Swiss-Prot record:
PANTHER family reported in the protein's UniProt record: 39S RIBOSOMAL PROTEIN L12, LARGE RIBOSOMAL SUBUNIT PROTEIN BL12M
Protein role: Forms part of the ribosomal stalk which helps the ribosome interact with GTP-bound translation factors. Is thus essential for accurate translation.
Key word Ribosomal protein present: yes
Family to which the UniProt record says this protein belongs: Belongs to the bacterial ribosomal protein bL12 family.
Single GO cellular component term: cytosolic large ribosomal subunit
Subunit structure: Homodimer. Part of the ribosomal stalk of the 50S ribosomal subunit. Forms a multimeric L10(L12)X complex, where L10 forms an elongated spine to which 2 to 4 L12 dimers bind in a sequential fashion. Binds GTP-bound translation factors.
Protein name (Swiss-Prot/TrEMBL): Large ribosomal subunit protein bL12
A Pfam entry, by short name: Ribosomal_L12
Lineage per the UniProt record: Bacteria, Bacillati, Actinomycetota, Actinomycetes, Micrococcales
Molecular function per GO: mRNA binding; structural constituent of ribosome
GO biological process terms held by the UniProt record: translation
Gene3D superfamilies to which the protein is assigned, alphabetical: 3.30.1390.10, Single helix bin
InterPro entries noted in UniProt: Ribosomal_bL12 (IPR000206), Ribosomal_bL12_C (IPR013823), Ribosomal_bL12_C/ClpS-like (IPR014719), Ribosomal_bL12_oligo (IPR008932), Ribosomal_bL12_oligo_N_sf (IPR036235)
Length: 129
């Protein structure tokens, strides 16, 4: 098997859907017995006091947009999920049907709030973490 360069690997990952990439990460974690979770989150959760936690929340610059429920207008929510993530119809429907699920991960505050507004406008229940 030929060794792939970093650029070739990144090009291959760019072609994957969000769901395919998530499945790859899970398989990678299982194969090599590692986790993709940020070690900072463990340290912050373990020793943070109430005041320190509030200060950390204000400084947070990466957010996850979590779809809690699709609501009554599932078709509109699926359309918004597709627009935000570039997923195909089936992948977006599966993601919406499997709520609660993350729609976007590690995005800036402005992008997260805009996505939340669009999804809520379509009838979804959304949280930012």
């Amino acid at each position: 098997m030929a060794k792939l360069t970093t650029e070739e690997l990144l090009a291959a990952f760019e072609e994957l859907t969000l769901i395919e990439l998530s499945e790859f990460i899970k398989a990678f974690e299982e194969k090599f017995d590692v986790t993709a979770a940020a070690p900072v989150a463990v340290a912050a959760a373990g020793g943070a006091a109430g005041g320190a936690e509030a200060a950390a929340a204000e400084e947070k610059d990466e957010f996850d947009v979590i779809l809690e429920a699709a609501g009554d207008k599932k078709i509109g929510v699926i359309k918004e999920v597709r627009a935000l993530t570039s997923l195909g119809l089936k992948e977006a429907k599966d993601l919406v049907d499997g709520a609660p699920k993350p729609i976007l991960e590690g995005v800036n505050k402005e992008t997260a709030e805009k996505a939340k507004e669009q999804l809520e406008g379509a009838g979804a229940t959304v949280t930012l973490k």
